[in-house]
Curated annotation (Swiss-Prot):
One of its GO terms (cellular component) is plasma membrane. Keywords: Cell membrane, Membrane, Transmembrane, Transmembrane helix. The keyword Membrane applies. The keyword Transmembrane helix applies. The chain crosses the membrane at residues 20-40, 46-66, 100-120, 126-146. It is a multi-pass membrane protein. It comes from Methanocaldococcus jannaschii (strain ATCC 43067 / DSM 2661 / JAL-1 / JCM 10045 / NBRC 100440). This is Uncharacterized protein MJ0785.1. It is found in: Cell membrane.
Amino acid sequence: MENNKCGTMRGESVYLAYPFILGSVIFVEFFIFGLVYLTFGLGLKTIIITSGVILICLLPISIILIRLFIKSIAGKNKGKLIKKYTKLKILNKKYKILKVLLFIVGINFYLFGNLVSLNINPYTKFVLYSISAFFIIISIVVGDVIVEFYENGVFINPLGFYKWGEVGKEDLNDRLILKIDKLVIECKR
């Protein structure tokens, strides 16, 4: 059986950009169109179709903005790329529990919106559904990271940039177990 290599990095900072920006885009969109629905009395079908079209347009824009944001927080001389891991898994139990709890919260908001839909106005229903989408999206993307080893440090997208620690460049094999602050990440290629 292959022994996993283990290394420790000195973390500088942790960022969770993707979940909150993407979730916020969806939340704001439904919030605005909920107001439009109440103000101008547009049909629910029109609002849903228009929201979907605008969401499709907003996602690429938000991804571009996220990329720029990530570059700004990691705006350092990273040096040459040594190795990139794309199949990663955060082994901390609290992240697994967090994913499940966030998903349950999102489903609860969705079910609550369905159960009380006859007794509430459409605006409130939109708010409940947007909150549901926000939590479900966060539950899906929490722990979804990419690790890139550069000459001058390690960039964990979207968590941030870290300096080299005890892990050596010769240890960058498949199934590397990387410890950064309190995070434990299994790296696979």
